Amino acid sequence: MKQQRQLISTGSPYEPKIGISRAVRSGRVIAVTGTAPLGPDGKTVAIGDASGQARRCLEIIKAAIEGLGGKMSGVIRTRILLTRIEDWEKVALVHGEFFTDIRPANTIMQVVRFIDPNWLVELEADAIVEE
């Protein structure tokens, strides 16, 4: 039997251009793509502030997971991508605000740059929908 896929879009201008969804649910699994710090208007928020950008990314991730019937408590893995590795601790503390009791597996890594040079951070998440 073929599993049904559900897709979530957040209106990012990049989603239709490059053929991606913000998040995809297949069965009980939800995968949230690299999430940039964009406001509802599609513009970068918190320019120069890695923790502010991380907070916005996690708000978008939370909305996507909930939009597909999941909960943040179902998150099993996150990835933090930074252009400045020295921002790791302040971004990780914001991550901790969202996941204190959940404590998913996590990877933090530095990248050279993102599509928009104002982005300091992107986050990804994988979740399981609890039964």
Features from the language model and the residues they span:
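N-terminal presequence-like segments and the immediate start of the first folded domain
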Residues: 1-59, 63-76, 82-131
